[in-house]
């Protein structure tokens, strides 16, 4: 498929406000994609790689602006791009407005006056090469490859190419739309597509399988050791709710650590974060433990916790120091010890256990590991739950989890089968989408942060956070967010959604101040959720539930 055809279809999808018609348009796009089906299914969501693949393009706004300016000719520079961006508000519109192709005569790209048409597969290959570029000269190489794409792009192509490069397709298509479109395009049941997406974590693979092998092929898609899936999630709840619903509750400790998914292929282990980033290298002692303890291939779910020499848990920030460490891991290991608490078993020796009840999955887990298994207790009344919770808190842990003993494991879902019960202040995980410059001694730092919840198509602000941040933390946050700054207008700064804050609050109020309709009362910075991406942040739907 030529990229011009994809861009034209994407423009049509963007202009369609109705959800059902959008699904139909995406379904038609998938049906017409031919050999590019897998790529098209990802591109329309703004993805270059499958969801399970943590490979990143590593192209920031500045590099994109430079490539665009170069393709626009000698009379345009990056500052011009940023000025236009401030005027129109999004990079796609800027790219579309430029007269690209002004540098075709450059010898580096063969000269000539005819533009070689972009294709979907060609764009994918170039972006994959961009992601693989590393070492000295890689920045220049990325800029030149990106320039070549923009230099060959027609206006509509440039709009969606720029958005794709920065991961912001802005056409209102998410995983749910693609799921429904695959089902419609290839006449397979939507629940079958949903299950396959949960297991494969790759919409391209699922789309191709649905087209080529139908429902039977989707049913054959299983877990693969080394291919991570999204973690099953919990929502807030009470012991009374759990016992009323289930009769008996499975109760386990809620650790103040970081979620990990363990993949062991029979020889070596790999670890993945909740965000599906590989964290094998920073956690060698966990890898060693798994490789010494397991005798058959398996996929486990668990938590890695920083501990003192006596096993007492250390603060959450300590484990994040280990997750972020890429160099001198041995020294970090000496400084901060970690332990694995496995609490679920998804796959054992070729057998998927997603549809197996929790109680049985935990039994299988205990048969695999002699140590490192999070204990699972069963309670029939609220007093028993309270006793277990007290023991967990006395041991220095965060609280408890309540789980339905009969529940299956549904990757990526947040439902009533897992409930988290914490005694601490209520918090939300929110995306930083803006900031304001500080005052006084903080005048050279971003000092107040706009935090937003996930919405149907983007993010909606629910408050501003300035309290709870030390001067040292503020400097770190400033450095962390500076590469994601899009535009500035006076003291107001627009920030690309990339960093998730955990924000404490006293109350959620209805308010006309923000487009979300809500405002946090007394919001307070708790920390950065290094284990979460913007797509994992709390949604407006959850805030609706909390306020109802």
Curated annotation (Swiss-Prot):
Catalysis: reaction(s): ATP + (deoxyribonucleotide)n-3'-hydroxyl + 5'-phospho-(deoxyribonucleotide)m = (deoxyribonucleotide)n+m + AMP + diphosphate
One GO BP annotation of this record: DNA recombination
PANTHER family registered for this protein in UniProt: DNA LIGASE, DNA LIGASE 1/3 FAMILY MEMBER
Protein name (record): DNA ligase
Binding site for ATP: 252, 259, 274, 303, 343, 414, 420
Biological role stated in the UniProt entry: DNA ligase that seals nicks in double-stranded DNA during DNA replication, DNA recombination and DNA repair.
An example molecular function term from Gene Ontology annotations: metal ion binding
Active-site residues per Swiss-Prot or TrEMBL entry: 254 (n6-amp-lysine intermediate)
TM spans (from-to): none
EC numbers: 6.5.1.1
UniProt keyword annotations, A-Z: ATP-binding, Cell cycle, Cell division, DNA damage, DNA recombination, DNA repair, DNA replication, Ligase, Magnesium, Metal-binding, Nucleotide-binding
Cysteines engaged in disulfide bonds, as pairs: none
InterPro entries xref list: ATP-dep_DNA_ligase, DNA_ligae_ATP-dep_bac/arc, DNA_ligase_ATP-dep, DNA_ligase_ATP-dep_C, DNA_ligase_ATP-dep_cent, DNA_ligase_ATP-dep_CS, DNA_ligase_ATP-dep_N, DNA_ligase_N_sf
Magnesium recorded as keyword: yes
Organism listed in the record: Natronomonas pharaonis (strain ATCC 35678 / DSM 2160 / CIP 103997 / JCM 8858 / NBRC 14720 / NCIMB 2260 / Gabara)
């Amino acid at each position: 498929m030529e990229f011009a055809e994809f861009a034209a279809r994407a423009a049509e999808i963007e202009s369609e406000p109705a959800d059902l018609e959008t699904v139909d348009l995406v379904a038609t796009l998938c049906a017409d994609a031919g050999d590019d089906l897998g790529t098209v299914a990802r591109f329309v969501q703004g993805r270059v790689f499958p969801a399970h693949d943590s490979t990143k393009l590593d192209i920031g706004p500045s590099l994109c602006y430079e490539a665009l300016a170069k393709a626009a000719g000698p009379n345009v520079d990056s500052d011009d791009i940023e000025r236009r961006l401030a005027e129109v508000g999004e990079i796609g519109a800027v790219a579309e407005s430029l007269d690209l192709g002004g540098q075709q005569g450059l010898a580096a790209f063969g000269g000539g006056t005819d533009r070689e048409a972009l294709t979907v597969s060609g764009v994918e290959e170039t972006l994959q090469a961009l992601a693989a570029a590393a070492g000295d000269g890689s920045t220049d190489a990325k800029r030149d490859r990106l320039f070549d794409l923009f230099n060959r792009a027609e206006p509509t192509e440039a709009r969606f190419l720029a958005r794709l490069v920065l991961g912001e397709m802005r056409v209102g298509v998410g995983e749910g739309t693609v799921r429904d479109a695959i089902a419609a395009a290839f006449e397979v049941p939507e629940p079958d597509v949903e299950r396959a997406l949960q297991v494969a974590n790759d919409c391209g693979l699922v789309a191709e399988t649905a087209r080529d092998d139908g429902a039977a092929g989707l049913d054959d898609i299983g877990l693969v050791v080394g291919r991570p899936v999204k973690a099953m999630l919990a929502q807030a709840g009470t012991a009374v709710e759990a016992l009323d619903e289930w009769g008996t509750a499975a109760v386990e400790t809620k650790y103040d650590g970081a979620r990990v998914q363990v993949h062991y292929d029979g020889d070596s282990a790999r670890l993945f974060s909740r965000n599906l980033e590989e964290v094998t290298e920073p956690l060698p002692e966990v890898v060693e433990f798994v490789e010494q303890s397991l005798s058959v291939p398996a996929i486990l779910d668990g938590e890695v916790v920083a501990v003192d020499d006596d096993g007492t848990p250390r603060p959450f920030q300590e484990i994040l120091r280990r997750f972020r460490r890429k160099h001198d891991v041995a020294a970090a290991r000496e400084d901060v010890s970690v332990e694995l608490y496995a609490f679920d078993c998804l796959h054992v020796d070729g057998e998927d256990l997603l549809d197996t009840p929790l109680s049985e999955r935990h039994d299988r887990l205990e048969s695999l590991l002699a140590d490192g298994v999070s204990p699972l207790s069963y309670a029939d009344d609220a007093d028993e739950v309270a006793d277990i919770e007290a023991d967990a808190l006395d041991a220095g842990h965060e609280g408890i989890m309540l789980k339905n003993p009969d529940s299956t494991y549904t990757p990526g879902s947040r439902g009533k089968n897992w409930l988290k019960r914490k005694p601490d202040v209520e918090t939300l995980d929110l995306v930083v989408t803006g900031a304001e410059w500080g005052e006084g001694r903080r005048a050279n730092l971003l000092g107040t942060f706009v935090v937003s919840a996930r919405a149907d198509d983007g993010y909606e602000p629910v408050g501003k956070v300035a309290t709870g941040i030390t001067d040292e933390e503020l400097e770190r946050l400033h450095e962390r967010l500076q590469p994601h700054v899009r535009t500035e207008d006076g003291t107001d700064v627009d920030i690309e959604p990339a960093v998730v804050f955990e924000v404490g609050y006293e109350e959620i109020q209805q308010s006309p101040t923000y487009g979300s309709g809500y405002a946090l009362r007394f919001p307070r910075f708790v920390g950065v959720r290094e284990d979460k991406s913007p797509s994992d942040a709390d949604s407006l739907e959850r805030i609706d539930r909390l306020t109802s």
